[in-house]
Amino acid sequence: MGDNGDGGEKKELKENVKKGKELGRQAIGEGYINPSLQLARRLISLGVNVTFATTVLAGRRMKNKTHQTATTPGLSFATFSDGFDDETLKPNGDLTHYFSELRRCGSESLTHLITSAANEGRPITFVIYSLLLSWAADIASTYDIPSALFFAQPATVLALYFYYFHGYGDTICSKLQDPSSYIELPGLPLLTSQDMPSFFSPSGPHAFILPPMREQAEFLGRQSQPKVLVNTFDALEADALRAIDKLKMLAIGPLIPSALLGGNDSSDASFCGDLFQVSSEDYIEWLNSKPDSSVVYISVGSICVLSDEQEDELVHALLNSGHTFLWVKRSKENNEGVKQETDEEKLKKLEEQGKMVSWCRQVEVLKHPALGCFLTHCGWNSTIESLVSGLPVVAFPQQIDQATNAKLIEDVWKTGVRVKANTEGIVEREEIRRCLDLVMGSRDGQKEEIERNAKKWKELARQAIGEGGSSDSNLKTFLWEIDLEI
């Protein structure tokens, strides 16, 4: 067949794409959006123009996008469809179908974004994509655009994912049935079934993540030592960062607002993509009225909502302990269409002892001197923010990677204590109180060790991200290696 002209146009487009200094970022969930925005900010400070791409729905929900982030020189925004722009997919919906639609619609949108940018004279020259979006790298490669994965969880978890899909899956699955059995993997601490990511069990409630995760791991395995940017720092996970020879993991974290690192850039605290409306900011005034190190901060993240039974145990633990608390208590109506009520008597007692809010700006809370500890679900953003804040932790993991993060908190970094659930998976009130009393009570050997370690990691984190620190150097080296000027 004769050349119909398409080949020439494609070649010309590839040439257009290769010229320039534009870097595309793709992220979808808030757990990735906030560190991704911080990564964008760091890249911009090094002279790189960034196009930040996320789903239509996430972009619509990014409340702060309209002020600081929208006026940042060097940063532009784009959205792509995941097939559910009208919010028709519920949290308990068919997520296998969602991932399929995300790939189909997202691929079309990214193709349009790349071609439009090239035709407008601002070509994308590198793509950084988030976990489970490996199709973005496939699309980029058709235009000869190189790419790298941004992993917003710890290097230990990335190594676990890679091992699971590259020769160790059967071994891990066989030991998941025995809580007393240890799982030994190169470069990682000894782990038990209680420390494993929740989707590793093929029969578990999060098994729907296995297929897209397998696709991601196999995609990385087919490449020649691909670069992976990881939201951690060298001193925190030295062994895990070197555990997988087939991957070149580069620690570039902690990717958090400068306010937690001792910076004074007020706009940076709002350089995030809040997907939930903040009801008010009177919680800061409330914290101002409390003594130093006297408040327990409680948050289980943007996705998890405690069951009725578990929430009741937490309520009783708080009331019985007497500790003052600030609790980010989201309504169940956000997740299940059923609003949970706390009976009036308990609610009155809770309001006398502490404060409950539907949402807050966590960065502002964590840097407040009134905080004494952080009861957290151990999502990675919250975990690394606790480390940078120097706060002792009560680890209350719920799902996905959180049990692994809790293991690291308690046994590796030793900055907190982890709650132990009963055989039904419920953490009872006595156990919650035991952990709270340990980190908030009178000083003893374990409490003092936790406080010492919290201060140590706080300093090491700030050193890593500072000028000339390991993470600062790693990011500059990355840009030099991909031939983007700094």
Curated annotation (Swiss-Prot):
The keyword Transferase applies. Its EC number is 2.4.1.350, 2.4.1.-. The keyword Secreted does not apply. Pathway: Secondary metabolite biosynthesis; terpenoid biosynthesis. SUPFAM superfamilies: UDP-Glycosyltransferase/glycogen phosphorylase. InterPro entries: UDP_glucos_trans, UDP_glycos_trans_CS. GO terms for molecular function: quercetin 3-O-glucosyltransferase activity; quercetin 7-O-glucosyltransferase activity. It catalyses: mogrol + UDP-alpha-D-glucose = mogroside IE + UDP + H(+); mogroside I-A1 + UDP-alpha-D-glucose = mogroside IIE + UDP + H(+); mogroside II-A1 + UDP-alpha-D-glucose = mogroside IIIX + UDP + H(+); mogroside II-A + UDP-alpha-D-glucose = mogroside III + UDP + H(+). Pfam families: UDPGT. Highly expressed in young fruits 15 days after anthesis (15-DAA). Belongs to the UDP-glycosyltransferase family. This is Mogroside I-E synthase. It comes from Siraitia grosvenorii. The gene is UGT75-281-2.
